[in-house]
């Protein structure tokens, strides 16, 4: 079994190191994070689950770990635990989450968008991040936003779930569509997104 090391909070995403791979994800409101390692993009369950210790693997808003022996091409995802409050934080630990800083994505052949919402597990049909060498990644083809992380807000939503309900404030003919999301822009701006 590979050694589990403390890792570093920066850079975010996955980074190949001399000993293996460092993983780091921002999850400031989480009280627990698991790193899931998969053997293939179609794997219905992870080969390994690494439970990140809050004392060892958390620095401020960042959860991080270095796993010895891993290499480029490794597939991974996260489970994030925390409060589930109506109108507040929506942690759903049954969901495998894609790293927002992943440089590669696999799993499209098994991905089921409808399983991304609700409380049911999506482990067998989730997208997975791919560990890619930073120096091989074409940053010019995928430029970073020109604002600081302190000013960055990542707001994940499902178009249908966000706009389909009758109390969403979206016109019936636009519910469940990208046009419905346009109707919700003032709400998102009020949140600071």
Q: Residues of each region from the PLM?
A:
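Short S/T/G- and acidic-enriched coil/turn segments that sit immediately N-terminal to beta-strands
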Residues: 61-64, 181
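Short proline/glycine-enriched turn/loop motifs at strand-loop junctions of beta-rich domains
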Residues: 26-32
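Beta-strand signatures of extracellular beta-sandwich domains
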Residues: 34-36
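Conserved, mostly hydrophobic/aromatic
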Residues: 25, 78, 157, 188
């Amino acid at each position: 079994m590979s050694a589990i090391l403390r890792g570093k909070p920066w850079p975010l995403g996955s980074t190949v190191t001399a000993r293996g791979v460092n993983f780091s994800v921002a999850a400031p409101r989480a009280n627990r994070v698991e790193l899931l390692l998969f053997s293939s993009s179609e794997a219905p369950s992870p080969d390994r689950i690494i439970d990140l210790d809050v004392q060892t693997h958390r620095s401020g808003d960042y959860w991080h770990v270095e796993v010895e022996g891993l290499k480029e091409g490794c597939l991974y995802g996260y489970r994030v635990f925390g409060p589930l409050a109506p109108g507040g934080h929506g942690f759903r630990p049954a969901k495998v989450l894609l790293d927002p800083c992943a440089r590669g994505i696999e799993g499209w052949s098994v991905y089921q968008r409808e399983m991304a919402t609700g409380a049911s597990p999506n482990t067998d049909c989730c997208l997975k991040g791919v560990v890619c060498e930073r120096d091989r990644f074409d940053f010019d083809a995928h430029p970073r936003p020109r604002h600081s992380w302190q000013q960055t807000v990542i707001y994940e939503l499902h178009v249908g779930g966000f706009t389909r309900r009758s109390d969403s404030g979206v016109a019936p003919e636009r519910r469940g569509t990208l046009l419905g999301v346009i109707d919700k822009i003032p709400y998102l701006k009020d949140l600071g997104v």
